[in-house]
Amino acid sequence: MASTARSLRYALAILTTSLVTPSVWAHAHLTHQYPAANAQVTAAPQAITLNFSEGVETGFSGAKITGPKNENIKTLPAKRNEQDQKQLIVPLADSLKPGTYTVDWHVVSVDGHKTKGHYTFSVK
């Protein structure tokens, strides 16, 4: 009987661990961005807004914006939305002119995982 109870506790511990562990291994994935990927906007954005699946660390996160002539677009320091630690805001120093822009973003999630990606959008 003691052996059966021990086996049951062991099986329950393994099941519980397998249900909890995947969330620890998660990475911050980009869930939404503004301007959206492949969007053609008529009004130039004042900032790039990136939303992730989990909270991000602003000190290790940011974005590089490249313009139509492959030039670097000046940005201000990235900041996190005060009400939403999953949202990173990258203010633009100057207004964007018409053309296609590439956003190369990188984040470190609150659990320490690094993620990066890129997308493009156009200003008409």
From Swiss-Prot:
Source organism superkingdom: Bacteria
Binding-site positions, Cu cation: H27, H113
UniProt record, GO biological process: copper ion homeostasis; copper ion transport; response to copper ion
Subcellular location: Periplasm
Keywords from the named record: Copper, Metal-binding, Periplasm, Signal
Keyword Aminoacyl-tRNA synthetase: no
InterPro entries, A to Z: CopC-like, CopC/D, CopC_dom, Cu-Rt/internalin_Ig-like, Ig_E-set
SUPFAM superfamilies in UniProt: E set domains
Name of this protein: Protein YobA
Organism annotation: Escherichia coli (strain K12)
Classification lineage: Bacteria, Pseudomonadati, Pseudomonadota, Gammaproteobacteria, Enterobacterales
